[in-house]
């Protein structure tokens, strides 16, 4: 992995609690829409128009982009919105009830009229959306946003400066490439998780870092548990049946002739199961953690859940070290390549997540920094070439099984 322009990225920029089915097509647009209306200063807004471009338009229906934008215009955030109220609020809007902005102002909003779909890509990124606010026929505010994957987004001003709105936080151990990371670990006698912990202290205390990482893990664990319990078929029109629940029951009660067979393949069944559970929850639009995206959100929690289930001495400290190390690899992918499926294909999502999970596992198993980096490299290269080609634009086929395979 080569070097790029320095910017400070936190592990908490990669692991974010949000909702499914897509970090780039659901989480990012919701955040961007909220950002737009929160910045409005005009006393009277009569209309807001949203134009979705490129991939947001091409696959936005299947990813619920229009729904996400509407909820964002209401001032909601992916991490805090009450999922049980979304369908009711959208139905009310479609029944001609007004859309209420965060400042309390109500305006008529018709999704068929005020959300436009334009598959033409804008130059900066394939995931683009233009929001315009009117007072009567007069434009009072407009901005263009680009959803970069993983819930990251930038507006046009930031795009004109070249990309991410760079965080200039001074880190004790800044690195732009894997080589730099390994050199720092060797020079200072640190593991990758130890180095990442020191860098994270630039933003928050060690206690806060550990607490927040455990909160992230608990959200991941909850998505696994919810996925194992849920049955039925997934929304989206493909009629895909949830499989995690029935597979879980099979693993808990294997046929008599398999009860005494415990092999590495048995363990892999559990890893596959955990990944399926998470991604079925994601496809259903439930609460998720980007890792580093929603489309690849099953891989990191599945591998971590495997470690905690089958390693007798596993503890909370391992969870923290696993996620810190995984975050380091995600940061390298984000800085030097991309985690956006719309930009570089599924290899950028599933490949990055596989590298992150492999690195985290190698770390908690006692690997040296070089071994951790090698694990990440192997995980990444085995997913090279995967394109982002979901059937009918819905994050289900082949997305769910790709997580299990990775």
Question: Which role fits each region the language model picked out?
Answer:
Residues 6-8, 12-19, 30-52, 63, ...:
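Non-transmembrane, aqueous-exposed alpha-helical and coiled segments at domain scale
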Residues 15-33, 283-303, 346-355:
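Conserved phosphate/anionic-ligand binding catalytic regions in large, soluble enzymes, centered on
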Residues 24-39, 301-313, 358-366:
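Alpha-helical support elements that line or immediately flank enzyme active sites
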Residues 47-60, 92-99, 323-336, 377-390:
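Short, mixed-charge aromatic SLiMs
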Residues 70-89, 118, 358, 363, ...:
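C-terminal domain-closing interface element
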Residues 75-259, 270:
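C-terminal regulatory domains involved in ligand/effector binding and gene-expression control
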Residues 207-345:
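Accessory "access/gating" subregions that flank catalytic or transport cores
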Residues 314, 325, 332-403:
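Hydrophobic alpha-helical bundle architecture
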